[in-house]
Amino acid sequence: MVPCGAVLWRRLLRKRWVLGVVFGLSLVYFLSSTFKQEERTVRDRNLLQVQEHEQPILWKEQFSSGNGSHLSNQCRNSVQGKLLITDELGYICERKDLLVNGCCNVNVPSTKLYSCDSCLPNGCCSVYEYCVSCCLQPSKQHLLERFLNRAAMAFQNLFMAVEDRFELCLAKCRTSSQSVQHENTYRDPIAKYCYGEYPPELLPV
């Protein structure tokens, strides 16, 4: 014998209005769950963006300037120069005067700190290593901060990935489309490595 409850339930399910109510409640539950999930996704994405933007760039070296000759410390440097090298402390030296720890030997007279030799007032230099060394001057921090604020969207993939001043100066001083006037012509064929806010002036056609 079929229980009375089961019989009543079957009779209710046969009525269209009951099916409509069940369908409506299911639809409301589905939409509510979907919206809540979307809200959580948006909230998490916004939180991640805030955390990324709030992480400041490291403007100071991790150890004090002047101790580059101590082997206990390691320096990153500009690597690529055949004749000159700039380390992360701002010293520029001849490649032969580079220590095994990657730092310039500060005891060599030709080693210079924050040297702007070959650089013009607009922040463009004819030698990449001098561009990096000059860019690392503490007085250039505000200039670099202004550039980052303006370039955050246009160069987000490139400049928002840097973690400190040295990485920023390495990236900023590399020749880019800003230094090019035409496909194979630099705006300034001599001073083409720029850390400044603005590209070199266009050459007269």
From Swiss-Prot:
Record bears the keyword Transmembrane: yes
Gene Ontology BP term (one): positive regulation of SREBP signaling pathway
Membrane topology note: Single-pass membrane protein
Keyword Electron transport: no
Domain of life, source organism: Eukaryota
Topological region Lumenal: 36-205
InterPro entries named in the record: SPRING1
Record key words, sorted: Glycoprotein, Golgi apparatus, Membrane, Transmembrane, Transmembrane helix
Cytoplasmic topological domain residue ranges: 1-16
Subcellular location: Golgi apparatus membrane
GO cellular component: Golgi membrane
Regions that span the bilayer: 17-35
Residues of this chain annotated as glycosylated in UniProt: 67
Main location: Golgi
Stored PANTHER family: SREBP REGULATING GENE PROTEIN
Family membership: Belongs to the SPRING family.
Function: Positively regulates hepatic SREBP signaling pathway by modulating the proper localization of SCAP (SREBP cleavage-activating protein) to the endoplasmic reticulum, thereby controlling the level of functional SCAP.
Protein name: SREBP regulating gene protein
